[in-house]
Regions:
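Active-site segment flanking the S-adenosylmethionine/decSAM binding pocket
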Residues: 1-53
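Rossmann-like AdoMet/SAM-dependent catalytic core
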Residues: 1-6, 41-125
Length: 125
């Protein structure tokens, strides 16, 4: 069977190159039911990260975020260096209400590095 006729889950973890394929994801968004994308080096690429997320949100709703705790936060203005963002295509999302969640979610999110400090944050869609 032709996989391109199916709606699929796309998971991206390509160590900083994810920004280079955002246009491809948007161009092929109708073939993607769910998207899990790990954004790297966010502190260095803050504007690119924000722009990429805004563009993806035209077709996808954010349903979950997981912060990687490998690097401690330096100050209150610092943002996470690595975030895993889970999104669902707007056409199939039945729960289109505003999304707000405190993270981590108990029994769902676990630290990538258990000996490092936990990262707590809130997100509003």
């Amino acid at each position: 069977k032709n996989i391109y006729n199916k709606k699929n889950l796309l998971k991206i973890d390509i160590e900083g190159s994810e920004y280079e394929i955002i246009n491809d994801i948007i161009r092929h968004n109708s073939k993607i039911k769910m998207l899990i994308i790990e954004f790297h080096w966010i502190n260095k690429n803050k504007n690119l990260f924000i722009h990429s997320l805004k563009r993806l949100k035209l077709n996808f709703d954010v349903i979950h975020i997981h912060a990687n705790n490998y690097r401690p936060m330096k100050n209150s203005d610092d943002i996470f260096d690595v975030l895993e963002v889970t999104m669902v295509h707007k056409k199939i999302n039945k729960y289109r209400k505003a999304f707000r969640q405190n993270f981590p979610i108990k029994n769902l999110d676990f630290e990538c590095f258990p000996n490092h400090k936990k990262i707590f944050f809130s997100f509003k869609n």
